[in-house]
Amino acid sequence: MRKLPLFMAWKFWLICLYIIKVASTQIVIKSNTIVGGNNPSGFQNGYIVSGDAFLAFQDMNTVPMYQTVRIDKGGALYYINNDKQGFSILSDHNYNHPFVFLNEGTVVVDDRRSISPGSWTIKDGSFTNNGNIMFTSSQGDIFSIGSNYITNTGFIFSKGTSFEKPQRLQIGNGNIWINTGTVCMANTTYILENAIQGGGCISVGENSVFNIYSFDMQQQTVYLSHPSSVLILNGGHEVPVYGLGNGNGILYPDAPIRDIYYDSSTGIMDVTAGTNGIYKFTVYIGAGYNESNFEIVSSIKIHGISYDNYNFVRYRGPPPNLAPSVCQPCVEIPLYSFQVPDPYTTTNELGFSETVSFYSTYNENDIPVIGNTTIYVPPAIYTLTKVNENTTETDIISRVTGMGYNGLPFTYYTTITVGEMETGVVTKTITITENKSRSTKTTLMSRNYTFSFSNYSPISSSGTYSVSTVDNITTLTDTVANVSSSGPNSIVTATMTTYQNNHEFNNASVINVTNSSNIMVPITSTFYSSVDSNLTTPITSLTRTSQSQIVSHITKLASSINETTIANTFPSPAASGTNYTTVVTNAEGSVQTDIVSHITTTDSDGKPTTIVSHITTTDSDGKPTTIVTTFPAPAASGADYTTVVTNADGSVETDIVSHITTKDSIGKPTTVVTTVPYTLCASNADYTTVVTKSNVSVETEVVSHITTTAPCSDLESHVENQTTSPSMHTTSLVGSENGVSAKTVNDKPNPTIFTEVAVSEGTTSNAGYVTDQGSSLEMFAPTGASAVESGNKVSQTQTASIFHGAGSTFKIKFNTILLSTSLTILILLGMA
């Protein structure tokens, strides 16, 4: 055996040692590692990322990619450029050891935040991808895999983010490469350099172009997944293409397309181009297409290049077939997973606690980042009391926090001073003006003295206590009444709180109104009793008592077409609880004395309350309005009295005004003033009258009388019967309320009929609003009765058939008569 020369032997061993050294110096990443800056040390000989770990090169535009780059299954490798020049990353190796790139895990090459185009290149060696790889950029980078041996069984996604600057994908160096996985494209141009073997998929997505020239693509599936996808052909072999439709298509750049032939039975489309159709290519697109929807486009611009010679064919309808199963969905690969810190709580410089929590998200460049949220927890509202030799002042202090326009937190303090209150307000008017977008609250007040107090607390846990300031006047509102159940445009009476030290400080009540959006809005108003203007000594000790005041309102349409609501306060009744009178000058100049009546009752909480009657009607503009009802004052003795009334037709009649004491629907006492025409009954004799019928016939009718109890000379009831024939007549009960029910009781054998008419509770019909209601009374009688309307616009008609004979009696009993409606009853009863 021939021995090697000594020099040659040493050379051989040196080469072996060098190879061993190169292999042994590659760094192995076994835990999550983030490296910043260009060309970090320790990675110049290659790197291997173990499973369940990642290696991230950040804030750089160039790093080594030497000899061997391997990512094990479960591992990940990230190249991330943050605000640098575009990537300049190139593979390299020693002269006798080819470069190896092997990915079993995840690789992301992210140049989206670069400020110029870059490149990531494998120039030779071998490239094997059995995992997931994403190339992404914003400036039109070139991602090139020029290895001698290329195999892809996994997923490769070339995703540009700019429509104007699509990136370029290059795979292959002229050699055949194998694809059994999926290659996805978005905002990408991919120019094929040789045929692709294997049964894989090329998915051409948004604003992407796949140029296959004339290479054999029969083993691959091309999927046009977006309406802007383009496939470029130069003739040659048959190509399977899926997803043709919605405007995407096929470009033949070398000659104008002449004809399209589609065979629905085979799913094959033949395209001829050039003079006399000398060029031809065949595309398998599948069954289900409509040949009339194919279109040859005369001019189109693709990735900045114009094609103006009928070079593009497209299908206007949707693709009839689903995506092929061999093509994986084109889903973006996220960057390395963030370790989101746990939340924590701290105390800031303002003295209140902050809770800081973290989350992972993407920024405006689709880069994952960690964000944080800070929740500010200010202390509870507290009270500070200041005392000197003259006054005691209580301050309510709260803190408000927020975020300023610069994103920084701010805090300010609010202080409400309860002290040196101005009272003695004689009148207060609240006006709410709606203009469909905002409301304005105007308060008019007059004042005449001040006082201060301390140690205030609400008088009722069921009420609402609030402190508000208007026109520099602090108002304490302590409302016991429950207004939430009250309807819109309603008057709500409440038991108020009186603070007393020989003088009064009264809270008023709450009004519910509806704004322009038909939303019920409660208005809380404060009213003060008149007090001694000479009072100068501060009141520091107050005694609580209860008193009621009444608030009503008028809603009208103002000249500016805005709804205006005016709140009015009416004084409480006199201490004796009696009605009081007021002098009113009418529009025509006459003067009359009116009585204002009231009802003293209790509210739902058992508190005493006083109600002044009111009428809801409409004003001249057709808007709802509420007015206070007054009645002419009775004689000083309180007895019934008569008054002379001039009717609209000029006739004069004498009316009797009397009072009825009864109970309302909830059993509370109520007083009703009734007005009945005064009829002289000197003789009580029957008389005749001439009646002209609607058919112009004239007849004479007999008017007879029955004496019971009615307002005559002896205050007896006078019931008239007008008889023409034993037919049905109509009875009108004028001035009654809704809903009348009747029952007939036969309590005597020869028939004495007792009919009880019960007025059921309903919505009050008020003056100025006309309501006609009717119901039928089936009374035991062959003859009828009729009545006329008198003295009121509100009428209710009862139809009755009444049987009566000798000794029969007819009686009407009203179980319930509601407040503030003058009642005139005139019954015409026919007697047999």
Swiss-Prot record:
UniProt KW Glycoprotein keyword: yes
Annotated glycosylation sites: 187, 290, 372, 390, 435, 448, 472, 482, 507, 512, 515, 534, 562, 579, 695, 721
Pfam families documented for this protein: Hpf1_C, Hyphal_reg_CWP
Triggers of expression: Induced during biofilm formation on catheters inside the host. May be repressed during biofilm formation ex vivo.
Localization per record: Secreted, Cell wall
Signal peptide (UniProt feature, chain positions): 1-25
InterPro entries from the UniProt entry: AWP2-like_YTTT_rpt (IPR049451), Hyphal-reg_cell_wall_N (IPR021031)
Primary subcellular site in the record, as a coarse category: secreted
Region Disordered: start-end pairs: 722-747
Purpose: Mediates cell-substrate adhesion and promotes biofilm formation.
Domain of life: Eukaryota
Designated name of the protein: Adhesin AWP2
An example Gene Ontology molecular-function term: cell adhesion mediator activity
Entry GO terms, CC: extracellular region; fungal-type cell wall
GO biological process: cell adhesion involved in biofilm formation; cell-cell adhesion
Keywords carried by this UniProt record: Cell adhesion, Cell wall, Glycoprotein, Secreted, Signal
Organism: Candida glabrata (strain ATCC 2001 / BCRC 20586 / JCM 3761 / NBRC 0622 / NRRL Y-65 / CBS 138) (Yeast)
